Amino acid sequence: MIPANTFPALGNSFFPQETLLMGAGPVPQPPSVKQANTHIASHLGQRMNEVVEQLKAMARYAFQTTTPWVFGLSGPGSAAAEMAIGNLVHRRSRVLAISSGHFGLRMCEMARRHQAKVVLFEFDGREAFPLDRLRALLEQQVFDVVTLVHGETSSTTLNPDLPKIAALCKKQRALVVVDTVCTLGTTEVLMDNWQLDVVFCGGQKGLSSIPGVSLIAFSNEAWERVVQRTFTPTQWCYDALLAKGFWHHHRYHYTAPVNGIFALHEALRLLNEETLPLRIQRHRQSSQGVQKVLLQFGLTLAAPLPTRLDAVVGFQLPVWLSSVALIDHLLSQHQVEISASFGSPLLRIGQMGEQCRAANVLRLVTALGESLDALGHPVDLVGALKTVSAQYGHRELLQYD
């Protein structure tokens, strides 16, 4: 018999002090979301039915859509991308994959694995989107599905021309599939107004919920395409017609992630309570404070306005300063974590959900300033703290412990 293992419990010795997550996700969770995640119940029955219906209503507000076709699913935002593509794309599909980084390429790869005829349209996300180049391509070729990312976290760039891109694609009745994993709840996303057909996100970023439970919404046009499809999706768990059984008829599909659904419900409740305009304003205000501090510290921001992503702020260090050393110093000396970026020289600071609270930003700035100074890059930490404090109102600063 193979012997049993005797690992210790993951208690205080493994988590001596909770790390402040200020990277590209996951992000800190509000206490009420943490509490909701401790509850367990049957995934079927009246109580879960009520939770699911409320969750869908609150998700419609987050997506800014009236479509009935809203679903949750087990898995990260990439699983939601799989669900979107797997229900709309097959061997004969013509797919245009618009990409400015890692996650745009990921959807391109997903479509290729479904043996679609894929055209990759790459552009530099730091620059204005080449609408004329897209217009010329759409005049030459017809596509069934267009995939793109609203906020590309790998390059920390925003695509502010998303509404114009969608309008061009809709002229030839292509379905527009959009990754809003980091922008939902942090940046304006208007699914119906922008004519988006499928929009998805993970729970662990702008919504400040737990990883592993995601959201997806299909427009009526996209759902009609799902219903009329002539193929069977290769992934059983992410078949939208099967998922409809649980999310719309309260029938068994697979054992739903009950704790995660409760956590996501609470995260969406908090968003609805705060309202989108106030939440987006809070994110913009906090992110701008972080951006100002990075510039005061003599660091280089990765993207210019208006393509700079507020939700995940990218920056570069002087060439002589090791990004690995900075990440390690922040974590070992201050229990603050920021992110690298897929092997590029970029470092990333998250400004999503609970990351955009005065207490968390002030702790981040203090840790970053002290770490830079310790690594031989002196900074004006007092001035930086004054700068970021000016971004917050007096009431929120009083909450800083």
Which ranges hold each PLM region?
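A glycine-/small-polar-enriched, mobile loop at the entrance of the PLP active site in fold-type I
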Residues: 18-74, 78
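N-terminal glycine-rich, Lys/His-bearing helix-loop that initiates the first secondary-structure elements
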Residues: 1-38, 395-401
